[in-house]
Every structure is written in C-alpha cells, then in structure tokens.
C-alpha cells in the first residue's frame, strides 16, 4: 500500500530489505529443494502444536472478473504525472510482530571483498532511472522495482513506470501513470492503489505488471503480448477476496504459473490474520484468454508465524525439472518458534492447471542468527560506519 511522502535523501527501508532477502532465498530454495517435495506432508504445522490444530488448505478457484487486450501503450494516452507537493498517503496495516532488537555477534560476517565473484560482474551500461519526484505519490517506501528484458529495461516507482532502451539508456515511453496501462479497461484497475510489481518472464519473453485496487481486494495484472513493453497487453482483474484487506503482493514467475503471496488483515487494518498464497494460470494469461486464480486459503495460526511469505521467481536459462513446485519462503524470526529458520512450502498447481493442487510445508533450511534491524520500526535510516568494518 502507498505510504506517507518521503524526502529526497536516502533512507533505510526494512520492507525493501525484506523483499530482497526473501526473493533471493526463495530462488535458492527452489533450486535445492526439488528433491524434498514428493513425500512431504500436506499439512503445514507449527512446531510443538498438537495434530488437532494443524492447518489444512481450503482450495478455491477464482475466475478473472474481467480481461481484455489493450491498445499499444505507445499509442495510448499515458496520463502524464502532474507535479504535486509532497503529501500524506494511507499507512500500511502493521503486522505487529515484536522483534528482538538487542545486538549479537554476526557469525557469518563477510570479512573479505569477493573479488573473484565480482570479476565477471561488470555493468554493461549505467543510466538514471525515473527522476525525482517523477511520480504523483512521493511515497515512503517508493516501492521501486524494475526488470531487464530482451531489449528494454522497465522501472516502476509508486505510481509511475518508464520504459528505457537498455542499450542506450534512452527513454522510450514515460514516465507515465501505472493506471494508464489499464486505460479503457473499466472498473477499479483504472484507479489502482499501489504496491506495483514489474517482472520479466524470461521463459516466454513477456512483461508482467501488477498493482492492487478496489480497497485492497483486487489484484490487477497485465501481461505483454510481446517482448516490447510499449506494445499491447493482456489485462486482468482478479478479486482476491472479500471481508478483509489484502496487502503487500509479491509475485514470482514459474513455468506452470504466476505465483503470489499477500498479507491479510481485517477490514479496518488493525489485526493481522495471516498470509495467503495464490497461483494464476500463466498459460491462459499468455494467450489472453479468461484465466483462473487458485488459492489454498488463508494460512493463519498456527501454520504462519506472522511473517510474510515470498514465492520463488525464475531467472536464468536452465528450467527447473518438469512439474517442480514453486517454493514459498517465510522470513525467519529472531525469537519465537520460527527461530533462525527459513520456513518453506512447496506449491504445486498440477497439470492441467488446478488438478490435484498441493500447498505443502517442507523441511526448512536454517538461517544464521541475526538481529532484525530497526525491529518493527519503519522509515529509519542507518548511516554506514565504514571505518569500523573489518578489513581482513
């Protein structure tokens, strides 16, 4: 959800850090965990809880409420972003997790510069993205994300997007309002409410853009029809639920579907109810056909420990084994019953999509002990103390 405005100077954002950590771990677990899923239990259980309190999925198939194919974005009105003063936007609901804030030794601190690993990591090109303020919201966090495609780089900053030529850095389209992607679509998607996601489906060479809308009960997703982000898009509106607020959508690309996790709150945003995984029929969405969304329902207590889930996102050229599930990873607690563990699930949608689906807790790898920075306190900045860092 969009948040209050932020000054131009940099700030530390735990939410961005959380997304980066979980996304990286999710891909790693997806690659190492293929052999774990065949015999795993279909019940996600919190350690120490009795069998009678085990969580069980309540599967639901939800059809897209509307879909169409857009005109080429380069030919549509881009709904330019007028300059506005900094302003307040609604705060996100707070999960309310109590984190341990005391210091402890870092058992896996990096003491040497990884020159051998960075030798081949040389930026091919470096250029400025969307300029400040560049978007209407000026929100904190700005939910900045972007992806590299075959010939383009697309960046999102709450509430705008811009398409760049990745070879020259020249702007091809924008910056423009994300809502303009849904111009002429009708309904709530034309007035989205933030938390945008931009991904590049490397398997199909297509773009994915999303944001939520409709009082945090709708997820609007568009899939480009080619590798050109300025062309036409297959657009969808999914109603993810009712009687609750669905926040913090995070999406991953997988061969058999687009996977997503959201945090779920009561309608007033005062109580965290749990996390909920979803899967979208990727095959239908790539073809521009009416599509379905599949969910095992809310993963609340005792299965979820009030920590967000992150689906794995495929990047690379080596596909996972046929039928391999998508891995969802829960951020580890620094205290509590999920102590220093990346609790993990495998989500399988079946073939064809929606046939005998499973959402399964699997053996979870350990996490090194750590202290959660700025425990439970958003919008805080930490200044680096370079002089105190070890040099050998």
Residue ranges and their predicted role:
Residues 1-46:
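Sec-dependent, cleavable N-terminal signal peptides
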Residues 39-392:
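C-terminal PAP-associated
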């Amino acid at each position: 959800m969009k948040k209050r405005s932020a000054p131009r100077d940099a700030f530390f954002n735990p939410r961005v850090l959380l997304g980066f950590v979980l996304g990286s771990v999710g891909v790693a677990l997806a690659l190492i965990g293929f052999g774990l899923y065949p015999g795993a239990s279909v019940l996600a259980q919190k350690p120490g809880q009795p069998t009678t309190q085990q969580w069980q999925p309540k599967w639901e198939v939800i059809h897209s409420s509307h879909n169409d194919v857009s005109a080429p974005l380069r030919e549509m009105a881009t709904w330019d972003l007028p300059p506005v003063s900094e302003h307040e936007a609604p705060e996100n609901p707070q999960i309310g997790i109590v984190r341990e804030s005391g210091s402890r030794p870092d058992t896996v601190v990096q003491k040497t510069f990884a020159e051998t690993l960075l030798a081949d990591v040389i930026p091919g090109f470096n250029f400025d993205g969307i300029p400040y303020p560049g978007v209407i919201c000026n929100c904190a966090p700005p939910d900045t994300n972007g992806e590299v495609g075959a010939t383009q780089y697309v960046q999102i900053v709450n509430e705008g997007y811009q398409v760049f030529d990745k070879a020259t850095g020249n702007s091809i389209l924008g910056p423009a309002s994300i809502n303009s992607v849904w111009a002429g679509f009708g309904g709530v998607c034309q007035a989205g409410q933030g938390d945008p996601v931009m991904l590049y489906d490397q398997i199909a060479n297509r773009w994915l853009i999303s944001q939520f809308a409709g009082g945090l009960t709708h997820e609007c997703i568009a899939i480009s029809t080619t590798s050109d982000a300025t062309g036409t898009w297959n657009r969808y509106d999914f109603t993810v639920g009712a009687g609750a607020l669905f926040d913090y959508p995070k999406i991953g690309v997988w061969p058999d579907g687009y996977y997503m996790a959201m945090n779920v709150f009561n309608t007033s945003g005062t109580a965290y109810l749990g996390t909920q995984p979803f899967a979208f029929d990727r095959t239908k969405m790539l073809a521009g056909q009416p599509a379905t969304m599949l969910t095992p329902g809310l993963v609340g207590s005792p299965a979820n420990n009030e920590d967000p889930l992150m689906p794995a996102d495929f990047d690379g050229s080596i596909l996972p084994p046929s039928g391999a599930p998508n891995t969802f990873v829960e951020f580890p607690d620094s205290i509590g019953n999920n102590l220093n563990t990346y609790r993990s699930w495998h989500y399988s949608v079946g073939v064809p999509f929606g046939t005998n689906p499973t959402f399964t807790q699997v053996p979870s790898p350990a996490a090194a002990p750590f202290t959660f920075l700025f425990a439970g306190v958003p919008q805080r900045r930490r200044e680096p103390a370079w002089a105190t860092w070890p040099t050998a």
